[in-house]
Regions:
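Periplasmic polypeptide-binding modules associated with outer-membrane biogenesis and secretion
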Residues: 1-141, 171, 351, 372-374
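Gram-negative/organellar outer-membrane beta-barrel architecture
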Residues: 64-65, 84-311
Length: 399
């Protein structure tokens, strides 16, 4: 890389080439509740000031809306160090993960001290709208069966004053099935879910900032053939590469599903092979972990470019429980399966790859295609994949 000299203009107008100046960071301040009208025009003063690790945090009218430690750990520009453009980019990227903030602006001002050029750094942050509600209504038509669905969602972007995002959602759906003899034979579903997304979690031995997400989910489905309830809980780590923000990684540290079928009609039982009924329509646990990688080069600023997306996922379930069952000498049932609290648990490995591409024909038309490949293999405590992890052909995108 060729670095051109710094051109200095003298008072008489002449220009000379000199070495680039090195700037050291002097003072660093983080301003919350930044508003150009009140802070610049009216010269409003902060309500509270906190100093932590040599950095001044100036709180505004909303008080200590975000904990000082969270703001401090989001900043990579430190007093006494040389100015570095990379640390500025890292700071922008880190503050962008704080959903409690709307805008971030980093400013520098020159300060000459003992013949050394220094910079004062001010990080200006504006708060986002912390709470929001959403309502969705939709109509459905599945093979001539009409129905509707509705959901209500709530989100809080600063639950524990650390920019944690709390989300909750309830959903209901109803579908009138063709040929039903009474309203009670139609399909309906109810579900509720809640999750907390933490802005970052520094993972040992890695330099990426992980976001941690914990979630719980409950859903119940009623059909003429059966009634099924599913309780789920998960602990995930999510991160994006700083060098490639279009790539996303999700590591499912722990994913737990409990499937309960309190009712199955006799006619439905008679229509299924015994093995399918035994392994797919019985109560069971699914306890496992997995990893998902996704990439999408879509750019909303350039909608006329060809785009593609790739998604790869891998999941394993039941291995830890199976190992513990063998280690403790647990008894097997008549089918040769171990149980957890008297309930079967699934054991399998599963992988999926999806690829899609869109080719722009003109400003109104695109050609799109998609291909997906998936493989699942049950073993150990299972002879078939659980119904919730099985593959299907049909629906709006049927092949």
């Amino acid at each position: 890389m060729l670095l051109k000299p710094y051109r200095l203009q003298k008072p008489d107008g002449t220009v000379v080439d000199t070495l680039h100046r090195q700037y050291y960071i002097k003072d660093v301040s983080i301003v919350t509740d930044y508003d150009p009208l009140t802070l610049e025009e009216n010269n409003a003063m902060p309500y509270d000031t906190v100093r932590t690790d040599g950095i001044d945090i100036l709180y505004g009218k909303n008080g200590r809306s975000i904990r000082p430690g969270v703001l401090r750990k989001s900043n990579y520009i430190m007093p006494g160090r040389l100015y570095n453009e990379r640390t500025v980019e890292q700071t922008y990227s880190s503050f962008a993960t704080l959903r409690a903030l709307r805008n971030v602006n980093i400013r520098f001002s020159e300060v000459e001290e003992n013949d050394t050029m220094k910079l004062n750094c001010t990080i200006l942050t504006s708060p986002a709208k912390l709470q929001g509600f959403g309502v969705d209504l939709e109509g459905t038509n599945s093979a001539g069966d009409f129905g509707f669905a509705s959901s209500l969602s709530y989100q809080h972007r600063n639950l524990f004053k650390g920019s944690e995002v709390f989300s909750a959602k309830v959903r209901g759906a109803y579908e009138a099935l063709t040929g039903s003899q009474s309203e009670g034979n139609n399909f309906w579903e109810f579900g509720a879910e809640a999750s907390v997304l933490f802005p970052r979690f520094l993972f040992p031995f890695l330099h990426e900032n992980f976001r941690r997400k914990m979630k719980v989910n409950y859903s119940i489905q009623t059909r003429p053939e059966f009634k099924r309830a599913i309780v789920s809980a998960g602990w995930n780590y999510i991160w994006q590469e700083r060098s490639n923000m279009q790539a996303r990684h999700v590591f499912k540290l722990l994913d737990i599903d409990y499937v309960h079928l309190p009712k199955i009609s006799q006619s439905f039982k008679d229509s299924l092979p015994e093995s399918t009924l035994l392994y797919n329509f019985t109560d069971q646990f699914i306890v496992g972990s997995g990893y998902t990688y996704s990439f999408n080069n879509y750019d909303p600023q350039n909608r006329l470019r060809n785009t593609h997306s790739v998604r790869f996922s891998f999941e394993m379930a039941g291995n830890l429980l199976y190992g513990l069952s063998r280690l403790t000498g647990a008894d097997k049932d008549d089918e040769g399966r171990y149980k957890l609290f008297g309930i079967n648990y699934a054991q399998f490995v599963k992988g999926d790859i999806d690829f899609s591409k869109s080719i722009v024909l003109d400003n109104r038309n695109k050609l799109a295609f998609h291909i997906g490949i998936g493989v699942g293999y049950p073993y150990g405590n299972s002879k078939m994949l659980p119904f919730e992890r099985s593959y299907f052909s049909g629906g709006a995108n049927s092949v």
